[in-house]
Amino acid sequence: MPTIQQLIRQERELLKRKTKSPALKGCPQRRGVCTRVYTTTPKKPNSALRKVARVRLTSGFEVTAYIPGIGHNLQEHSVVMIRGGRVKDLPGVRYHIIRGTLDTAGVKDRKQGRSKYGAKRPKPGEAAATGKKK
């Protein structure tokens, strides 16, 4: 344990926190271009075909980003916006593509949690047309 005199001479060094999303370089979102759009399988207890894209960012990084929601219109050379946020059952996927911005279309027919998927508010007449009631 250092003495008070030693602490006066040289204060304690603060521990540096390692970022979970280094490719964003401290920004909330980053723009990038899809270099490859494909599906991959999740870790052990789960089973699915998860939609992911390899994205070349403006920060110079190339990262793997998850495409949330049902259905998407992304292909190679699509310009996308990504945010931080990992996918627990996909190793190496630490970013999410933001739906409804740039070349990424919002999720069609989304009624709840629309803001997370870039879906517009349905018109009052459309709710009755689908035959769904609360």
Curated annotation (Swiss-Prot):
The entry's keywords: Methylation, Ribonucleoprotein, Ribosomal protein, RNA-binding, rRNA-binding, tRNA-binding
GO biological process: translation
Annotated Gene Ontology cellular component terms: small ribosomal subunit
Alphabetized Pfam families for the sequence: Ribosom_S12_S23 (PF00164)
Molecular function terms, GO-annotated: rRNA binding; structural constituent of ribosome; tRNA binding
Region of interest (Disordered), residue spans: 103-134
Residues recorded with modification 3-methylthioaspartic acid: D89
Superkingdom of the source species: Bacteria
Bias (Basic residues) ranges: 113-122
Protein family membership: Belongs to the universal ribosomal protein uS12 family.
Function of the molecule: With S4 and S5 plays an important role in translational accuracy.
Summary of subunit composition and partner proteins: Part of the 30S ribosomal subunit. Contacts proteins S8 and S17. May interact with IF1 in the 30S initiation complex.
Protein name: Small ribosomal subunit protein uS12
